[in-house]
From Swiss-Prot:
Belongs to the low molecular weight phosphotyrosine protein phosphatase family. Thioredoxin-coupled ArsC subfamily. The active site is at C11 (nucleophile), C83 (nucleophile), C90 (nucleophile). The gene is arsC. This is Arsenate reductase. GO terms for biological process: response to arsenic-containing substance. It catalyses: arsenate + [thioredoxin]-dithiol + H(+) = arsenite + [thioredoxin]-disulfide + H2O. Gene3D superfamilies: 3.40.50.2300. It comes from Bacillus cytotoxicus (strain DSM 22905 / CIP 110041 / 391-98 / NVH 391-98). Its main location: cytoplasm. CDD domains: LMWP_ArsC (cd16345). Catalyzes the reduction of arsenate [As(V)] to arsenite [As(III)]. Keywords: Arsenical resistance, Cytoplasm, Disulfide bond, Oxidoreductase, Redox-active center.
Length: 134
């Protein structure tokens, strides 16, 4: 964790979107960032999120579903909310913490193609961030 920035992906249940974002973040940003995720609540990692990431050869079976940790939130360099609910109810962040919102549809309970689409959209967005810093 030495001298790496912290990026913290947040969504409602830390089950689907933020789990996939954490995995893509580790894939594209892991050399420069400590990549973490959490939720307003912890619903457990959705098995379809695991399956969707496995399709692109990324294993998230060891990731855990966690509630937002105030210490991590306060130390993060960048907080990214991935759904409107998390954006609205996320605890206030200190002025030095940059906070952005990248909205994605919630794939939970949707057909398989929605999981694949959201997975790919999140991956493309994080890849763009890795390449451009925005």
């Amino acid at each position: 964790m030495e001298n790496k920035k912290i990026i913290y992906f947040l969504c409602t249940g830390n089950s689907c979107r933020s789990q996939m974002a954490e995995a893509w973040g580790k894939e594209y940003l892991g050399d420069k960032w400590n990549v973490l995720s959490a939720g307003i609540e912890a619903h457990g990692v959705n098995p379809n999120a695991v399956k969707a990431m496995k399709e692109v050869d990324i294993d998230i079976t060891d990731q855990t579903s966690d509630i937002i940790d105030r210490d991590i939130l306060d130390k993060a360099d960048l907080v990214v909310t991935l759904c409107g609910h998390a954006n609205d109810v996320c605890p206030t962040t200190p002025p030095h913490v940059k906070r952005v919102h990248w909205g994605f549809d919630d794939p939970a309970g949707q057909e398989w193609s929605v999981f694949q689409r959201v997975r790919d959209e999140i991956g493309a967005r994080i890849k763009k961030f890795a390449e451009t810093g925005e």
